[in-house]
Amino acid sequence: MSAPATTTARVLAFSARRSNGETRRPRAPTRATPASSSSTSSSDGEVPRRAALLAPGVLAAAAAASVSAPPTARAALDPTSSLTRRGMAKFVQNDVEGSIADFDLVVQNAPRMEPYMWQRGLSLYYAERYEDGAAQFRKDVAVNPNDTEEAIWAFLCDARDPKIGFDRARLTRVGPDPRRYMRAAYDLFNAGDAASDVALEDVASLGPVDEFYSLLYRGLWREAAGDAAGARDLIVEATRTQYANRSGDYMAALAVVHCKRRGWAT
């Protein structure tokens, strides 16, 4: 099995292990919280909100549909959730542009979902459409004022936008996040000092989820601040963690996509 197929299979397996997941608040169909398990829960008893919910069988159907009908016809046949999952499947396989096409169809066919399409924002970031990505994430924060990750990703888009650049003052203010690793990540992006970096590094010792997210967001911070070498070391290390290789978390796939887009060997 090829590496992209293996990654997608793990995401599918992660989805299959879910049981009775509930969303924290109204979001896109795929933003549900999977049931906790010893292998995926963090020190706070939390699981990542970005768990990829690619239902078994959806990927094969998506692949068939993508070659058998034009986008407008596929949109008429696919429910919003299937379009979203198909876009996520494409992203996992590093087909960023293809994922955007599906996510745009979701917004076109269900405009009410636009503020909740965090997946679209991530794809726009990797397509280097930073202004559009920042706008997507800020729409999310507007309806979810405690959304720490979207605030960080809006900042990351701004930092790479040549018209804006790195400016910590642009970090959107949000409420408290229940996940310790995301609170520490937000503190690093907000303060930008050595103490905050050490605090996020220390979180890594609390569990597999914490370790992965600590490495990922410390790496993303360094890249935003212009330290490409430091970013590479940390994000590549994140892709090699036990959690990244076993969980099927969408953000674990994102870390791999990040490395591929930057030309970093994992």
Model-predicted regions and their roles:
Residues M1-D44:
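N-terminal chloroplast transit peptides
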Residues S43-V58:
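N-terminal secretory signal peptides and thylakoid transit peptides that target proteins
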